[in-house]
């Protein structure tokens, strides 16, 4: 897996490229998002969408889901082998919203998957352009991360709802490749592994035979991805133990849960990328912007600049607050669901409120919702500053692996100090340090106890004016430290259920 051993940049993972220099990376990422934009324009033409309808984020999501479904080979194969009533395995579709006589109407469309694959390839220079597909998956995943909390899923696997900040990418499909693996949080990887181990406990044949060999390879690969996210030797050594276990069972589950808890202080490194809805790239391409020539990066100023001058609309339910809907989408666009609200506040330049205080439900509209009362409004996706996205957990001192920030997985490389109650977390570590991982557990607990809340993460890193594209003058914000800014805490957000 790319996240292990070979240090490739995200953009290389994103575009499946081998080592390239910065210019080549910018060009290939540009080619990827340009292809998404061209595909989107073509789909709007096919569906005869007006300019306004093409800028509607719900239409963008339907079109994105259609192309993802058209290329989902395993599911397509499964659907053909297990025909279910009323499902045509060769077709895909979804709701398209059109403006008619001053009202929004829902129209369910159906398309041949073959036709969609043809359009996608044609707009991507004849390639399958899997990088572009993964990019769309990550955008959907970031939207889910900002919209739902995974309390129920956490509890089901024996983890604690307080670990919600470790769950980035928990709804990414398995087929999302190296770029997908890079953005998955520690909790997400732990959860996937625990589910696997539980299946092995319940199903005697899970690890046996030809299939079992493939399962085992997948298990070890997932262990290596998770190991690569940890930044301390003791955590990595524990992952080796879990990976090498002859017959993974409850002991391994215990170890994994212990590691997930430890990641609340000794943060894992998780990538963050600004993946935007297809319609945003479409708008830019339609406006004559040449992504490949100009180059593009998912972790720099480019997405901020793109959002600065794109007008995107969203359907709004009768009792929703348009400003809150905008915040939700802004957070999704910058993969900032687990960022400290104080940092997001500063960058966005308007007040960012915690999930529980948002008067908005998810972006997608269910098929049984009444369209009569739907309105639409412009999403405010602009920002006051921009900042570089990070892939580190924000630990202040890599040698000592000191404190990261609890309930927060930093998105932006911006200096902040780390308000956390060590007592609260250490309480989760009473007792069990025996067994074959005892020395590693003891070492991890020792490191956590020596973590100092007054430490500063991302020392000297700041935000930049939008005119400062070369990032020459960092503005280091000073934050009011009285409160910790987690988005999900004290919260009653909806659950994400597949």
From Swiss-Prot:
A motif (Bipartite nuclear localization signal) lies at residues 198-216. GO terms for molecular function: RNA binding; structural molecule activity. It comes from the Viruses. One of its GO terms (cellular component) is viral nucleocapsid. A motif (Unconventional nuclear localization signal) lies at residues 1-18. Keywords: Capsid protein, Helical capsid protein, Host nucleus, Host-virus interaction, Ribonucleoprotein, RNA-binding, Viral nucleoprotein, Viral penetration into host nucleus, Virion, Virus entry into host cell. InterPro entries: Flu_NP. Residues 1-21 are annotated as: Disordered. Late in virus-infected cells, may be cleaved from a 56-kDa protein to a 53-kDa protein by a cellular caspase. This cleavage might be a marker for the onset of apoptosis in infected cells or have a specific function in virus host interaction. One of its GO terms (biological process) is symbiont entry into host cell. It is found in: Virion; Host nucleus. Coiled coil: none annotated. Signal peptide: none annotated. Homomultimerizes to form the nucleocapsid. May bind host exportin-1/XPO1. Binds to viral genomic RNA. Protein-RNA contacts are mediated by a combination of electrostatic interactions between positively charged residues and the phosphate backbone and planar interactions between aromatic side chains and bases. Encapsidates the negative strand viral RNA, protecting it from nucleases. The encapsidated genomic RNA is termed the ribonucleoprotein (RNP) and serves as template for transcription and replication. The RNP needs to be localized in the host nucleus to start an infectious cycle, but is too large to diffuse through the nuclear pore complex. NP comprises at least 2 nuclear localization signals that are responsible for the active RNP import into the nucleus through cellular importin alpha/beta pathway. Belongs to the influenza viruses nucleoprotein family. This is Nucleoprotein. It comes from Influenza A virus (strain A/Shearwater/Australia/1972 H6N5).
């Amino acid at each position: 897996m790319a996240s292990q051993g070979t240090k490739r940049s995200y953009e290389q993972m994103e575009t499946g490229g081998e080592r390239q220099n910065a210019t080549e990376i910018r060009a290939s990422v540009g080619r990827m998002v340009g292809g998404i934009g061209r595909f989107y324009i073509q789909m709007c033409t096919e569906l005869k969408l007006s300019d306004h309808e093409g800028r509607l984020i719900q239409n963008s999501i339907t079109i994105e889901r259609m192309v993802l479904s058209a290329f989902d080979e395993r599911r397509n194969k499964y659907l053909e082998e297990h025909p279910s009533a009323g499902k045509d395995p060769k077709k895909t579709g979804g709701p398209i919203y059109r403006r008619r006589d001053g009202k929004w109407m829902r129209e369910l469309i159906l398309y041949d998957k073959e036709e969609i694959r043809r359009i996608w390839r044609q707009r991507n220079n004849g390639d399958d352009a899997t990088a572009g597909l993964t990019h769309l998956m990550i955008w959907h995943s970031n939207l889910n991360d900002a919209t739902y909390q995974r309390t129920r899923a956490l509890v089901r696997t024996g983890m604690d709802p307080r670990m919600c900040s470790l769950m980035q990418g928990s709804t990414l499909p398995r087929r999302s490749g190296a770029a997908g693996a890079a953005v998955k949080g520690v909790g997400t990887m732990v959860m996937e592994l625990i589910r696997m181990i539980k299946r092995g406990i319940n199903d005697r044949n899970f690890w046996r035979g030809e299939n079992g060999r493939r399962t085992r390879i997948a298990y070890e690969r997932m262990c290596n991805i998770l190991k690569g996210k940890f930044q301390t030797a003791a955590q990595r050594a524990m992952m080796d133990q879990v990976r090498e276990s002859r017959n993974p069972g409850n002991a391994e589950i215990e170890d994994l849960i212990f590691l997930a808890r430890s990641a609340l202080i000794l943060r894992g490194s998780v990538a963050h990328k600004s993946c935007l809805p297809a319609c945003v790239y479409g708008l830019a391409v339609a406006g004559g912007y040449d992504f490949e020539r100009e180059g593009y990066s998912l972790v720099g100023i480019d997405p901020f600049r793109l959002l600065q001058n794109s007008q995107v609309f969203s359907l709004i339910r009768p009792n929703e607050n348009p400003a809150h809907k905008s915040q939700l989408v802004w957070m999704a666009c910058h993969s900032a669901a687990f960022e400290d609200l104080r940092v997001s506040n500063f960058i966005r330049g308007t007040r960012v409120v915690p999930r529980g205080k948002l008067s908005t439900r998810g972006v997608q509209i269910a098929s049984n919702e009444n369209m009569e009362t739907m309105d639409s409004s412009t999403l405010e996706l602009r920002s006051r500053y921009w900042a570089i996205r990070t892939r580190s957990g924000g630990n202040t001192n890599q040698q000592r692996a000191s404190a990261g920030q609890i309930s927060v997985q930093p998105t932006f490389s911006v200096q902040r100090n780390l308000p956390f109650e060590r007592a609260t977390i250490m309480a989760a570590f009473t007792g069990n340090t025996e067994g074959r991982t005892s020395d590693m557990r003891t070492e991890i607990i020792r490191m956590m106890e020596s973590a100092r809340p007054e430490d500063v993460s991302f020392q000297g890193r700041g935000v930049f004016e939008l005119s400062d594209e070369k990032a020459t003058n960092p503005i280091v914000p000073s934050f009011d430290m009285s409160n910790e800014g987690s988005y999900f805490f004290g919260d009653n957000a909806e659950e994400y259920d597949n």
